[in-house]
C-alpha cells in the first residue's frame, strides 16, 4: 500500500509529512478536515518492519490498552493492513512537548510532570500488558539488530563513539543485571513523547508507544534522565535530570541499571 490509498479515505485533509521514512515508516499530519473532525496523524509502515517500534498493529493494541487504563493517549481512528503495509490513523492530542523550550519558571514543573507520568505508567497492571520487553526479549532483539546491520554506529553516545556492534554486545553481556524490577514501561520515555498543558504543566498526552511493554522500570527512567541531561535541549541539563529522579523516587533508582539501560537503547 502507498499513501495514495489512504489519502483517498481522507480527501478533505491537507497531508504534511512529519518524517522522512525512518526504518520504512512514514508519518503524516492531517489538517483542515471538515468540522468538527480533529487533526489527525497517519502512520504507514511495512507490514513486517525491521524495527519492532514500527509494528503498527502492535502500537494500536498498546494505545487501546493504555486508553482503557486511563492514560491520555491518541484515540485510534483507523487501523489496518494489506499484503505489504500496515497503517494507523489517530487523533492528535493537545499540548506542548516537554522537549520544547519552556519558560524557565516552568521547567522544573515539566520534568516533575514527566516523573509523575512514569510513576503512573509503572503502577499499571503487568498481567494483561499486551507486550513483553523483558531483557530476554530485548537483548535477543538487540543481537538481531547487530547481525542485520540495523544499529546506527555513527549515532552512539559520546562515551561509546567508535565502538563496533560486537563491542556493544560484549558490554551488554558484561553489565546485564541479574534481576529485573518489572513494571509497564513506555519504552521511549523522552521529552519529545510527552505533551503537557502550557498553563498547568499537567500531562495531556503520551505518544509513540511502539516500545511499550513489561520491562524493568529503569528502561524508562534511564532514557528520560539521559535526554534531560544531554545538551540537545540546552534549556535542560543535569539539574533537571536530577530533579526528575528525585520526583520519581531516588530510593528506587539503581545507577548501574541506569547505565545498562542507556547502553541497551543504543541498539534501537
Swiss-Prot record:
GO terms for molecular function: ATP binding; kanamycin kinase activity. The active site is at 188 (proton acceptor). The keyword ATP-binding applies. Transmembrane segments: none annotated. CDD domains: APH. Its EC number is 2.7.1.95. It comes from the Bacteria. The keyword Transferase applies. It catalyses: kanamycin A + ATP = kanamycin 3'-phosphate + ADP + H(+). Keywords: Antibiotic resistance, ATP-binding, Kinase, Nucleotide-binding, Transferase. GO terms for biological process: response to antibiotic. Belongs to the aminoglycoside phosphotransferase family. Resistance to kanamycin and structurally-related aminoglycosides, including amikacin. PANTHER family: 3'-PHOSPHOTRANSFERASE, PUTATIVE-RELATED, AMINOGLYCOSIDE PHOSPHOTRANSFERASE-RELATED-RELATED. This is Aminoglycoside 3'-phosphotransferase. It comes from Streptomyces fradiae. The gene is aph.
Amino acid at each position: 500500500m502507498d499513501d495514495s490509498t489512504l489519502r483517498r479515505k481522507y480527501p478533505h485533509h491537507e497531508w504534511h509529512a512529519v518524517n522522512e521514512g525512518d526504518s520504512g515508516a512514514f508519518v503524516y499530519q492531517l489538517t483542515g478536515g471538515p468540522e468538527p473532525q480533529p487533526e489527525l496523524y497517519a502512520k504507514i509502515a511495512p507490514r513486517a518492519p525491521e524495527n519492532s517500534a514500527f509494528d503498527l498493529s502492535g502500537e494500536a493494541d498498546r494505545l487501546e490498552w493504555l486508553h482503557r487504563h486511563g492514560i491520555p493517549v491518541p484515540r485510534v481512528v483507523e487501523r489496518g493492513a494489506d499484503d505489504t503495509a500496515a497503517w494507523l490513523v489517530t487523533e492528535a492530542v493537545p499540548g506542548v512537548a516537554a522537549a520544547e523550550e519552556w519558560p524557565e519558571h516552568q521547567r522544573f514543573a515539566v520534568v516533575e510532570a514527566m516523573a509523575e507520568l512514569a510513576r503512573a505508567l509503572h503502577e499499571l497492571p503487568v498481567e494483561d500488558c499486551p507486550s513483553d520487553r523483558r531483557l530476554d526479549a530485548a537483548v535477543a532483539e538487540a543481537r538481531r539488530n547487530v547481525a542485520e546491520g540495523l544499529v546506527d554506529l555513527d549515532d552512539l553516545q559520546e562515551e561509546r563513539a567508535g565502538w563496533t556492534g560486537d563491542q556493544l554486545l560484549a558490554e551488554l553481556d558484561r553489565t546485564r543485571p541479574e534481576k529485573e524490577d518489572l513494571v509497564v514501561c513506555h519504552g521511549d520515555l523522552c521529552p519529545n513523547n510527552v505533551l503537557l498543558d502550557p498553563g498547568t504543566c499537567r500531562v495531556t498526552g503520551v505518544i509513540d508507544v511502539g516500545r511499550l511493554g513489561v520491562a524493568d522500570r529503569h528502561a524508562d527512567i534511564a532514557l528520560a534522565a539521559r535526554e534531560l541531561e544531554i545538551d540537545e535541549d540546552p534549556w535542560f541539563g543535569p539539574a533537571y535530570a536530577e530533579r526528575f529522579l528525585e520526583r520519581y523516587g531516588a530510593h528506587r533508582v539503581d545507577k548501574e541499571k541506569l547505565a545498562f539501560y542507556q547502553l541497551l537503547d543504543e541498539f534501537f
